[in-house]
Amino acid sequence: MARELCEVQGLIFKRKKYKEADVLTKIMTKDHGIFTIDVRGALRPKSRLGAATLNFSYGKYIVNTNWKGISTLRTFKDVKQLDQLYLDLTKNAYSSYVLDLLDHAFVEYKDIGSFYDLIIKALLKINSGEDAAIITQMVQLKLLNAYGVAPQLDRCLICGKVQGKFDYSLELGGIICSDHFNSVSQRMHLDPKVVALIRTLALVDIDRLGKIKINPQLKKDSGKVIDRMYVNYLDLNLKTKKFLDELALF
């Protein structure tokens, strides 16, 4: 396939040195998925391309590509940066993990569909100071769909009940209503409030997530359950997740 110049709308992440003065960076795009671009001369002093491809920069990028392998950045326009994600260590850690999860869910150049808007909205919320942990938990739950291991959280696995108190079963991959607690041995015996929060984050659109304050212990408990889902269903062992967990210890 011949190479062509194409304008893509996207966000830059995962930047690393390549050759003497170049960098390779990943870009998450609205219509062409995630792929790698070679930013030539990015490490040279006063490089315009380098400044426009710092992590968490977003805008329109003109690339030379044949839609496989490494594409090459030619120029850009209307580029801005989510500066708080770049400057604030905690926001950076959460955002890097969110993007890493997305990156591992798709092969390069595959359309990521509605997940583009989900991630952009999540990053904008984190950048503006909203609860990064809760936003990340929401993205974690929704991205399980991209991995093909989404649990059933909208209704009881046994009877289909949608309201009431629920528990969760890792083995069965979904929620159990209180009518069937005694008939299911493989449940986690969670506080119903934890399950309710997880259900809300999984089922509600991110646009409806306002600036809410969640009890710190409840937020911690829901995070542990979601982490167990990822370990049981995927076991990704991402460096960004390990760093985020280490950061939480301080």
UniProtKB/Swiss-Prot annotation:
GO biological-process terms attached to the record: DNA recombination; double-strand break repair
GO cellular component: bacterial nucleoid
TM stretches of this protein: none
Top-level taxon: Bacteria
UniProt keyword annotations, A-Z: DNA damage, DNA recombination, DNA repair
Family annotation (SUPFAM superfamilies): ArfGap/RecO-like zinc finger, Nucleic acid-binding proteins
Pfam family, one: RecO_N
Family: Belongs to the RecO family.
Function: Involved in DNA repair and RecF pathway recombination.
Protein's name in the database: DNA repair protein RecO
Species this protein is from: Lactobacillus johnsonii (strain CNCM I-12250 / La1 / NCC 533)
Gene from which this protein is expressed: recO
